[in-house]
Curated annotation (Swiss-Prot):
GO terms for molecular function: ribosome binding. It comes from Synechococcus sp. (strain CC9902). Pfam families: PRC_RimM, RimM. HAMAP family: Ribosome_mat_RimM. This is Ribosome maturation factor RimM. Keywords: Chaperone, Cytoplasm, Ribosome biogenesis, rRNA processing. Residues 104-177 form the PRC barrel domain.
């Protein structure tokens, strides 16, 4: 395993910096986490630009935009629009051991990435979950075995079973969803 892959295993990407807000260096973060305190409670956070290791920055303030899944955050060392724009596209990260404890049958959404997607428990996989897109409803991005991509709403009616230990999830899509 390459050194860069080794340090990546020590981190979880819990959001992506997708834009700037205003002139004072505020950043818009699209979360990939069900824990809003990662974007609102002041303290150390880590930001990783593509190809670089995460660097520690201090979160000063954070708030969720009303009616949206986006958070607006202010970092200690980012005080103008130019500095903020330099961080757009960066990952918002936490140490891998910073996962909140979960109850029986619960899982972290990020754990879905890498799972095989199947249409029945005994069938061959139709693809692999490659990303999670947060929004009004979370979407699973699945790379199909033919290389095409498929977006599946992550709701219990369509994804009724998740088998983390076995590395797969079950899809029961309504007619036509697989054809999109």
């Amino acid at each position: 395993m390459a050194d860069s892959e080794e340090w990546l295993e020590e981190w979880l990407t819990v959001g992506k910096i997708v834009g700037v807000q205003g002139l004072q260096g505020e950043l818009r973060v699209n979360p990939a986490s069900d824990f809003p305190e990662r974007f609102t409670v002041p303290g150390p956070r880590w930001v990783r630009s593509k190809g670089s290791p995460p660097r520690e920055m201090q979160l000063k303030t954070g708030r969720q935009l009303p009616g949206k899944s986006l958070f607006v955050v202010r970092l200690d060392s980012v005080d103008n629009r130019d500095a903020a724009e330099a961080l757009v596209g960066s990952d918002w990260m936490v140490p891998a051991d910073d996962r909140p404890q979960l109850g029986e049958g619960e899982f972290h959404l990020l754990d879905l990435v890498g799972l095989e997607a199947r249409l029945s428990p005994d069938s061959d996989p139709i693809g692999t979950v490659t990303d999670l897109i947060s929004g009004g409803n979370d979407l699973l991005e699945i790379k199909r075995t033919d290389g095409s991509k498929l977006l599946i709403p992550f709701v219990e009616a369509i994804v009724p079973e998740v088998h983390l230990k076995d590395g797969w999830l079950l899809l029961t899509p309504p007619p036509g969803l697989m054809d999109l």
